[in-house]
Structure formats: C-alpha cells, structure tokens
A protein has these predicted regions:
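Acidic-aromatic/histidine active-site loop/patch
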Residues: 185-262, 271
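N-terminal secretory signal peptides
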Residues: 1-5, 16-21
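Extended terminal and domain-junction accessory segments
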Residues: 12-13, 19-22, 27-58, 163-207, ...
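Sequence-level motif detector for i,i+2 pairs with an aromatic at +2
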Residues: 51-56, 71-73, 104, 179-181, ...
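A generic beta-sheet turn/junction motif
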Residues: 272-274, 283, 320-322
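Histidine- and aromatic-enriched segments that form or immediately flank copper-ligand environments
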Residues: 53-174, 277-306, 326-335, 384-412, ...
Length: 493
C-alpha cells in the first residue's frame, strides 16, 4: 500500500562532483504525510516490453563528509559501484539502477527530464512508496532521447543538500566532433556550513503573516535577499542568501580547472542543480554557441552569457583561445558567484572576482531559442487547454498553483494535445518543471523544454502530447517554493 503523499517528499536533487567519484547530498525532514490534491496514488505499472537492461548501476545513499575546497561539510551523497555517481548511456538504452538507502530517513530518485514510464519517475506517494532507511529499490527504464539530464532525490529538502548527479545520454544523431567535453554542475550550498536547508525554510516560514506593503497577491518582498537587481530578471530572484556557490562541488577560491589546447572545440554541458539560485553563465574572452537545451537540439545561437534557472540544462560549443579564462556563474540577485577556470596555456589564473565584458552582457533566456527541425512536434490544434496560475507571497511564506482556478490536478486523455497557459502572478521568477513529458513552446517556434523560466508577471504557453499515461508531478523547481505549495500534477483520465 502506497504511503500518503506529501509535498515535502517532492524535493528535487542537489549537487554533483563531476569526475571526482562523489556527489554531495543532504536531506531535510520529509515531514508528515498529507494527501496530494487529486493524487490517485496508483502509478501506471512498469511496461513488460522494456527488455534486458543494457546499463546497470548500483548506488548507496549515505551520510558522508564533503570537501568543497578546504571546507568540510558533513552531508549526504550517492556512492556508486563505479566510483563516479555520474551515469552515461546512449539513447535507447534500458537502465537498471539499484539504490540502497543508508540515510536516517526515506528517500527517492527522480530522473529529471527523462520521458520514462510512470512507475520509475521517483515521486514518493505518487509513483512509488518512499524508500525507507535500510531498504533498496530498483529503477528500470528506457532513455528514449539523447541529451544532458540529471537525477536527484525528490524527497523533502534533499534537493538543497545535494543528492544528485549527471545523467548524460549520448545521441547517435549528434556530430560528437568536439575535442573535449565537460559537464558543468552549478549549485548553491548551505548544508553543514550554516545550518541546514530546514533551518533556512524555518526562517522563511517564520517571517510572519499577512499582507506586506499591500502586495499579498503579488508576492510581496521582505525576505532574506537584498542583492543587486538584475536588469532582465529583477532583484527578487531568490529567497536564500547562501554562503557558497559551487561549480562541480568547489568554491571559487579552490576552483576547478578544465584543461585543453588552444583551438580545441569544447562542448560544455551545464546543469543548474541549485535549489534557489538562477545563474548567469559566461566564459571570459569567448562567445558560446548554444546547441541543445533540456536535451533537445536547437538552431545554433551565439551568445556571450546565458541565464540558467534551477533544473534547466544547456549545451554549448566554443572554440578555445590561447590563455587562461574565467568561467563564471553569477548568482542572480545575490551579489555572489560560482567560478572555475578553463586553461589552454600556462600562467596565473584570474581572480575569482574578476569582471569581464561577457559577464555584463545581456544574457540569453533559453526560452527565446528556436528548435532544430528534428526536435519539432507535429503541428496541430490543442484538444484541451488549461489555465495555470502561479501565486504566492513572502509573508506568510506560501506558494501555490491553481488549475482553472482550482487547487487540483490538470487532467488529460491519452492521445490528446494539451495546451497549458501558465501565468506568473507573483513578483518572483519560477522555473516550472513537468515530469514524464517535454513541452513544445509555440511562442518559440515549438522549442522543446521540460523546465521553463517564467519571469514575474510573464505568461507562457506550453503544449504537450499526452503519450505517457500516469499521474505526473508539475511544480516549481525552486525547492522552497515547491515545499510550501507550488506543486501540482498532470493526471490521465
């Protein structure tokens, strides 16, 4: 019998140390169980025609001590049978991932962006029972599309404690003509440094109640953030001022260095695994050519900087010059940054606080890209349209999703084309994520995305083909917003 569902069991994953064989992680208390609105608690059964697994991995989720650059954080992480929690596969592979929970509380794994069958989606109380301490669970699923993905816990605030790692799926249709390739994981970090994510949530939810400056319905301000406003996203881009921002698990003063040769063609796969931070990414002295977002190819677009919200991924290519170059990810609205170095020559590395023209350029919003022809969904008129209103405020700290004016799930029938009209009625940006499907954005020529950033006051139209039966989570990928109510689902009738 499946346990009752709790929004605090829906939190997404954290931070990976790509190539180091360890993944940082921690967890918040999943909290008391409470039924999700409209949840059937009956996942669609595992398909019988998956075939034998072609990629097998074993993971243990356990407490560990993480060195983020001369600073030890006692946290939680994934320990892999291969020594590296990152998983690589090829489109069409069948994965079997066996996880044993050595944590003191229940956990789960969600395979972010993968259009897998419902029973493997990793949402406790909706698609599976929680994996209790001492228990094991096997996830078996096909990866149908190539691209940059990641996996993470979907239990409590384990997102902000780092239980996550990259999942890279090779696409036989990609050229794969790069000389070097790096996976770049961006994260915000507090666990084991200044308390825990639960402590941060307690601060937010304990700020008081009622209207603030007459803006209750529009998400009034008054929280912990006092960063410099961003000219594209505004100043209220997050709720938590973290002590550290990381690239591949390292703080700026103990940064990662990526080495190549002058003239090399590099492919960089960026993943924002943060819980509350939108990053603006730039590489000093270079323009980047965007080739994919959220796993799907796009029409190549050259840019100097890119906004990457929580849960989004983007692939870029760049021809590397001769020298030592800063790779900087500004924490938008927080007056801080993550930092690494790309080196193709000897010499002194730049200081982490270095500013450069690309960093101050107008950043690219990924929703403005156009899809490659092979990523397009067939054009058609929607069979059903639902109105999605995003609401909430800081005081009291509460967030919500209303579907057609009700706090209930969106519904669809298999085979239908569903149009979701999302309206952000708050003063904050929200990265909205759909499980089990990938949207096509009509306003961007059919761009394929599973995570879309809605700026304050923005309306975005997103279509999907209902070809994957079950009940699927739909939520804000800001962990603190989802934990306090910005969560719903898409349910097949």
């Amino acid at each position: 019998m499946m346990n009752a569902f709790s929004r605090r069991q829906f939190l997404l994953g954290g931070l990976v140390l790509a190539g180091t064989g360890a993944v940082a992680a921690c967890t918040s208390d999943p909290g008391p169980a409470a039924s999700a609105p409209g949840s059937s608690l009956r996942p669609t059964p595992t398909p019988t025609a998956l075939g034998e697994p072609t990629v097998r991995r074993t993971l243990n989720a356990r407490p560990l001590s993480l060195d983020i650059g001369g600073i030890e954080a006692k946290t939680w992480g994934y320990v892999s049978d291969t020594g590296d929690a990152a998983i690589e596969a090829t489109a069409g592979d069948v994965l079997q991932v066996d996880i044993t929970n050595e944590l003191p509380e229940s956990t789960s794994i969600h395979w972010h962006g993968i259009a897998l069958h419902n029973a493997a989606d990793g949402v406790p109380g909706m698609t599976q029972d929680p994996i209790e301490p001492g228990e094991s669970f096997s996830y078996v699923f096909e990866v149908p599309h190539g691209g940059t993905y990641f996996y993470h816990s979907h239990s409590g605030l384990q997102l902000d404690r780092g239980l996550h790692a990259p999942l890279i799926v090779r696409d036989p249709q990609d050229a794969e003509d790069q000389d070097v390739e790096w996976t770049i994981v961006l994260d915000d970090w507090v666990d084991g440094i200044q308390g825990t994510p639960d402590d941060e949530l307690d601060k937010l939810t304990g700020m008081g109640s009622g209207d603030h400056n007459g803006k209750k319905g529009m998400g009034g301000h008054g929280h912990m953030m006092h960063g410099t406003p961003d000219r594209v996203l505004g100043g209220d881009a997050g709720d938590v001022m973290y002590p550290h921002y990381l690239i591949n698990g390292r703080i700026p003063r103990a940064h990662r260095t990526f080495e190549a040769r002058p003239g090399d063609k590099a492919r960089l796969r960026f993943i924002n695994a943060g819980a509350d931070t939108i990053f603006k990414v730039a590489l000093g002295g270079h323009r980047m050519t965007v080739t994919h977002t959220d796993g799907f190819p796009v029409q190549p677009w050259e840019t100097e900087s890119i906004y990457l919200s929580m849960g989004e991924r983007v692939d870029v290519e760049v021809i590397l010059d001769d020298g030592i170059f800063p790779l900087t990810a500004l924490a938008v609205g927080k007056d801080d940054r993550a930092f690494a170095v790309i080196r193709t020559a000897g010499g002194q590395a730049p200081h982490p606080d270095v500013d450069f023209p690309e960093l101050s350029s107008t950043g690219l919003l990924l929703s403005s890209l156009k899809p490659a022809d092979r990523a397009l969904l067939p054009e058609d008129t929607p069979d059903r349209e639902v109105s999605i209103d995003l609401g909430g405020q800081m005081m009291p700290y509460e967030w919500s999703i209303l579907t057609d004016g009700q706090s209930s799930s969106a519904t669809v029938q298999e085979g239908q084309r569903l149009r979701m009209v999302m309206r952000n009625r708050t003063m904050m940006p929200h990265p909205m994520h759909i499980h089990g499907h990938t949207w096509a954005l009509p306003g961007s020529g059919g761009l394929r995305k599973d995570t879309v950033l809605l700026r304050h006051g923005e309306t975005m139209i997103a279509d999907l083909i209902a070809d994957n039966p079950g009940e699927w989570a739909f939520h804000c990928h800001n962990a603190y917003h989802m934990e306090t109510g910005m969560f719903s689902s898409l349910r097949y009738e």
